[in-house]
Amino acid sequence: MVDNGGPKPLRDCDNHFGIPDDSGGIPRHVEHANAVAINSIKICAAAAKHGSHVIIENPVARGYKSQFAIKGRERHSSLWDFPPMVEFAKQYGMQVTVFDQCHLGASTQKTTQLLCSPAVHRFVNQTLGPL
């Protein structure tokens, strides 16, 4: 990854649960981020299981396999690559909408992905996307 002076990535394409530190362990702040993501997924799964609609928002993947790849971000791993998220999406038949936030008045492009419950996907896709 390109060093732009910002924080170092928590994950990469080979380490979806976190980039090991020098001792080979996952840093505490990455474990905390994983716990936040996993608990969020559990909440969404409970809602979906009881018939509620779910929409999860996060930036698109930017790694070398992504249609939205960015030079210098070849090893990028997004929330969408996180194994518990992949499993949740499969289990509940979640569907994807991708859109640029500038179409909604944002000052930058910020290509964003939404993971939607099947019952709301058509409306979300017609309203915001697709790219």
Question: Can you name each region flagged by the protein language model?
Answer:
Residues 1-131:
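Conserved active-site and SAM-binding loop architecture
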